[in-house]
């Protein structure tokens, strides 16, 4: 439920941060 969505959102945010870090 909400816990799964929260974890998924956190992972998505982390992946986005890593992608932006390597893109620079």
UniProtKB/Swiss-Prot annotation:
Would you tell me the Gene Ontology cellular component terms? extracellular region
Quote the tissue specificity entry.
Expressed by the skin glands.
What does the entry give for GO biological process? defense response to bacterium; killing of cells of another organism
Its keywords, alphabetically, are: Amidation, Amphibian defense peptide, Antibiotic, Antimicrobial, Cytolysis, Hemolysis, Secreted
Q: Does the keyword Lipoprotein apply?
A: no
Keyword Secreted on entry: yes
Secretion signal: which residues? none
Q: What is its main location?
A: secreted
Q: Which residues carry this modification: Asparagine amide?
A: 24
The protein's location, in the record's own words, is: Secreted
Family statement: Belongs to the bombinin family.
The record describes the protein's role as: Has antimicrobial and hemolytic activities.
Q: Please identify the protein, giving its name as recorded.
A: Bombinin
What is the taxonomic lineage of the source species?
Answer: Eukaryota, Metazoa, Chordata, Craniata, Vertebrata
